[in-house]
């Protein structure tokens, strides 16, 4: 049902763009100059397009910390979770940001046992304290989620079961090894800016983020 819904939305958006006069090209894009974009089509054919302005809107990718191995089935990111074809009885969610909270809400509603693992000394560490208190009461406490803070998932090994080495965040000493049916890695997202040939234009990123001015123009060295 979810896949069908996504296909319908994608088709409707495509039609809306085409009605607005937008030309849609499919392939892998890269910068070839200040007003030039290279495109590698699915067939392997390379093209170069000229444009007055170029907007970089490549989105983001899930961040997977060192030590965590994903296989897309028993250990997976939020991108892969929406296409998961099975329901784990017990799932550990690494990270307690908005993505982790959303999926914890979904999995508990589906009857899964959920353990939430947060490296910081409290869950939802980046939230406003008042919002975190309300969210914790409604999304964690009321759902009987086992939320653990101050623990670093220093190693995650896919399998049946998945093994998680939990270490004290400060000392890095092993606390316990947890065995669960699945692990969702929800430790944030990073800019999807690799492979755009930014360096050829003198654009230096900061952890993947593009430098911009007050009008959102990319800064070039």
What feature does the model see in each segment?
Residues 59, 111, 143-144, 202, ...:
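Short glycine-rich hinge loops at helix-strand junctions in the catalytic core
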Residues 4-14, 82-83, 88-92, 98-176:
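Rossmann-like dinucleotide-binding cores of NAD(P)H-dependent redox enzymes
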Residues 71-87, 178-221:
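FAD-site-proximal beta/loop scaffold in flavoenzymes
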Residues 1-51, 147, 154-163, 178, ...:
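Feature captures the FAD/FMN-dependent oxidoreductase FAD-binding
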Residues 27, 64-66, 102, 107, ...:
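Glycine/Thr-rich phosphate-binding loops of Rossmann-like dinucleotide-binding domains
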Residues 29, 37, 48-59, 93-94, ...:
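Short hydrophobic core segments
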